Amino acid sequence: MRFLRRQTRRLRSIWQRSLPVRFRRGKLHTQLVTICLYATVFLNILYGVYLGRFSFRRKKFVFSKGLTIYSLFVATFFALFYIWNIYNEISTGQINLRDTIGIYCYMNVCVCLFNYVTQWEKTLQIIRFQNSVPLFKVLDSLDISAMIVWRAFIYGLLKIVFCPLITYITLILYHRRSISESQWTSVTTTKTMLPLIVSNQINNCFFGGLVLANLIFAAVNRKLHGIVKEANMLQSPVQMNLHKPYYRMRRFCELADLLDELARKYGFTASRSKNYLRFTDWSMVLSMLMNLLGITMGCYNQYLAIADHYINEEPFDLFLAIVLVVFLAVPFLELVMVARISNQTLTRRTGELLQRFDLQHADARFKQVVNAFWLQVVTINYKLMPLGLLELNTSLVNKVFSSAIGSLLILIQSDLTLRFSLK
């Protein structure tokens, strides 16, 4: 145990020395959030979906005319390039309905163009929202264990970095198999991958916000658990005989102040998470729709390839089939991760901890604060529903999966009916 503690302190010291001076202030989780926030803003600007910038002189986000011109140029070039490719493939008959990856790419092009319009229209609202969030003040006031911080950080990396990396490797294997000229492999892969990355950027921003919100909820619950244990212990017969009423009243007042502070942080995090959803709801709904269509179309094309192999004795490429399965598994994995982190596990945990308080011999002010905190948890009703259509929780995965399976069964039944009617 001592060895692990020494190694942890050593890694933390190396981490502190490797950071730029601007990132060294604050606690470990604040430093990680600062770095991730800088990276997110940079990527949003690079892809042209964000028209603002952070002013170090004014210490807030501001609208930028220069970045607006840059974003217009990026979006125009992006739209012209992919619209010309789509038109060229339609006019020459190169678009094949069995090319799942190509059609999925062009569906994400539509999502990208829609995201450009919606994000530009909401730029001023987003900037006002960013400037109104005292994020680092809240983070610095919380004590979060390094294990929880790194777990959340790795979970975010899995969604934002490793899933696109798996998709990119899959596309390289796919294009090396389907395109003979090796010099065009990287160009084709990049052309296919870019819409997938840009269309997913807004969703990644919301996912990062949920990771951060869960981090704050976990810290609040950890502190709340300690308060529950101490408050219930102060009301035990042994402690009531051991301490005078004045000491217990003073301690209950101190615990009430701590609960008041936790209630403010909980309310701030829950309300801002729900408010941030309105900036990304259209992108999330469209992405889920495209993923549903892509998964259904990919599974149906796999069925057609297998049916042609066994019924019409056509060749079946097992390697391309495996590559396609991996490619379609990535968006489904991303959906599972979003549904899992959006589940109200931590907020329900807050309500359960508040119900554990024994208020029989507690101070009047402490009772009032506990009841107010409980009322806040109940009235906020922390449910994330983009456009009010579907709630983001674990049941969303079952709904998407059942929808894909239902559509797939209808298509397979129609195809089998057509095949055997022709015979």
UniProtKB/Swiss-Prot annotation:
Gene Ontology terms: cellular component: axon; dendrite; membrane; neuronal cell body; plasma membrane
Subcellular location, record wording: Cell membrane
Glycosylation-annotated residues: 343, 393
Main location: membrane
Tissue: In larvae, is expressed in neurons of the terminal external chemosensory organ.
Record has Membrane as a keyword: yes
Acyltransferase listed as a keyword: no
Membrane topology: Multi-pass membrane protein
Listed GO MF terms: ligand-gated monoatomic ion channel activity
Function: Probable gustatory receptor which mediates acceptance or avoidance behavior, depending on its substrates.
The name this protein goes by in its record: Putative gustatory receptor 97a
The organism of origin for this protein: Drosophila melanogaster (Fruit fly)
The organism's taxonomic lineage, starting at the top: Eukaryota, Metazoa, Ecdysozoa, Arthropoda, Hexapoda
Gene: Gr97a
